[in-house]
């Protein structure tokens, strides 16, 4: 099964920082909503987001953001705690929002909810070259057009540990 795909656009723009009191060395476009349609199309207006932070240098007072991919919609987050009683499968990590674009998923795993550092997990659609230390996740569609994240079992992919905290944005 294939997920829905968000409409995308590629934009470029610059920010003139010459009037700023403090002269920045870099400028960061934060992940999230960056543009909304000014006029409505039919009966709807549209919002566009960037999927991750983008930092560019400021050169001669100008920060140029070139070829920035923006996606239609709003980014959402889901969080899961790996069960202390049952850290191994069949623990289920189901994203509750239907009709998501799975290509925009970003998965981070922290040792515990209080941990400040995390490891990025990447999507895999194959077991080839996946070993016991690979930080990967798999996806399967479940009921009502929702998706479930599946993590390694310690043979194919790194196994999650009790009380690990999973951060998912999409």
Where are these regions (language model features)?
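Signature of Asx- and small-polar-rich beta-strand/turn repeats characteristic
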Residues: 1-170
